[in-house]
Amino acid sequence: MAARIGPMAGLLCVRWWSTAQLAARGGPLVACRRWTSSSTDSVYDVVVSGGGMVGSAMACALGHDIHFHDKKILLLEAGPKKTLEKLSETYSNRVSSISLGSTTLLSSFGAWDHICNMRCKAFRRMQVWDSCSEALIMFDKDNLDDMGYIVENDVIMHAITKQLEAVADRVKVLYESKAVGYAWPGPFSLADSSPWVHITLGDGSTLQTKLLIGADGHNSGVRQAAGIQNVGWNYDQSAVVATLHLSEATENNVAWQRFLPSGPIALLPLSDTLSSLVWSTSHAHAAELVSMHEEEFVDAINSAFWSDVHHTDFVDSASAMVHHAVALLKPTKVSARQLPPSVAKVDAKSRALFPLGLGHAAEYVRPRVALIGDAAHRVHPLAGQGVNMGFGDISSLIHYLSTAAFNGKDLGSMSHLTGYETDRQRHNTALLAATDLLKRLYSTSTTPLVLLRTWGLQATNAVSPLKEQIMAFASR
């Protein structure tokens, strides 16, 4: 069991394994008792609870996997089926940054082609800089290949839904259906050799499955029912999102992010004339931003990207010294600051806000249970990795489940589920820890910390191999 501990064991990966503890920690939906099976129960090889982007993609990937051609898969979604008959001229304010690794997953079951035929915007550079100094880091590709894509969540869901319909003979989708109870047939420690998980739906019907996959968000009922501890905290911040019109048309292929003392602000390209805003700030300031008149809101955005009000002469002088030292040590060209586009107006009714926090499940798997996406981890949007982490979970879990199916193994066995957990916890805990550290490091204008992060950012920007490693890690 020790091998399953992630790198932040003391903080994010606490484990509890005794049967007594597991029984004591049963969540509000769990009933750890023997279940008398009914012949009327529907039986599935895999049930995915939660039909958002990650849950739907999980079910779709299983349905398109060659080794699952003879399996029965069920996707449970509490909401109604969403249809997108045609694209609105107005862009949605909820978008995702899709990494190259995520495009590989979406391409594997045909969804990426639908997305490309609808709309998405590639970005080829990413500039991140500090509002308290001249320090910056520029991520780009030597050959100016695409680094990633900004896609509306509705477009992603439509593409996945189309591909789910293509495997309707293998994947059944129950919309407006929510699990209200889960029952494991005995102590978790014995479940590898026991009957299956039993699920009760809101209409009173019941079903059984060899493997239950929880993709039901950061308030996951599956995680609570399994008694899996979740470590997390709120950031006392909200993210303000909006769709913005630029002052003039540009190639608009750069993703911009500036760290303010109140939180990061990001501008993500949607088209040559439109960008999406994600501004993380205090709850009070977020509410103020959402209620501002349009002119005030636009002025606040432009000021956040352009103003040097947080600069000090001392920090600027120290930053200049390091810049000159780097230039002497590395005579080759170091990425220089580019100027972000200015904003002219905001789409009507596109402003919204949502609270921010961090969360991480101590375990991703139990016998016959696996967690993916926000059910397993919740991250600050400054990393732009929320849905990419979920898609990375899918890629890993599909690998282990496909191998198990090919070898005729029990899909709910810990013998392969632990491989998925180890793989993803190593990646996700590192990303969560780095994101949380950056959030805290940049949430201050204290001079010693400003100097520390300024020198760190300048040094990182000068070391191309290190930047390439960061980009490669983020794309997994």
UniProtKB/Swiss-Prot annotation:
Pathway: Cofactor biosynthesis; ubiquinone biosynthesis. It is an enzyme of class 1 (oxidoreductase). GO terms for molecular function: 2-methoxy-6-polyprenolphenol 4-hydroxylase activity; 4-hydroxy-3-all-trans-polyprenylbenzoate oxygenase activity; FAD binding; oxidoreductase activity; oxidoreductase activity, acting on paired donors, with incorporation or reduction of molecular oxygen, NAD(P)H as one donor, and incorporation of one atom of oxygen; oxidoreductase activity, acting on paired donors, with incorporation or reduction of molecular oxygen, reduced flavin or flavoprotein as one donor, and incorporation of one atom of oxygen. PROSITE patterns: UBIH. In the kidney, expressed almost exclusively in glomerular podocytes. In the inner ear, expressed in the spiral ganglion, as well as in stria vascularis and spiral ligament cells. It catalyses: 4-hydroxy-3-(all-trans-decaprenyl)benzoate + 2 reduced [2Fe-2S]-[ferredoxin] + O2 + 2 H(+) = 3,4-dihydroxy-5-(all-trans-decaprenyl)benzoate + 2 oxidized [2Fe-2S]-[ferredoxin] + H2O; 2-methoxy-6-(all-trans-decaprenyl)phenol + 2 reduced [2Fe-2S]-[ferredoxin] + O2 + 2 H(+) = 2-methoxy-6-(all-trans-decaprenyl)benzene-1,4-diol + 2 oxidized [2Fe-2S]-[ferredoxin] + H2O. GO terms for biological process: ubiquinone biosynthetic process. Signal peptide: none annotated. Component of a multi-subunit COQ enzyme complex, composed of at least COQ3, COQ4, COQ5, COQ6, COQ7 and COQ9. Interacts with COQ8B and COQ7. FAD-dependent monooxygenase required for two non-consecutive steps during ubiquinone biosynthesis. Required for the C5-ring hydroxylation during ubiquinone biosynthesis by catalyzing the hydroxylation of 4-hydroxy-3-(all-trans-decaprenyl)benzoic acid to 3,4-dihydroxy-5-(all-trans-decaprenyl)benzoic acid. Also acts downstream of COQ4, for the C1-hydroxylation during ubiquinone biosynthesis by catalyzing the hydroxylation of 2-methoxy-6-(all-trans-decaprenyl)phenol to 2-methoxy-6-(all-trans-decaprenyl)benzene-1,4-diol. Belongs to the UbiH/COQ6 family. This is Ubiquinone biosynthesis monooxygenase COQ6, mitochondrial. It comes from Rattus norvegicus. The lineage of its organism: Eukaryota, Metazoa, Chordata, Craniata, Vertebrata.
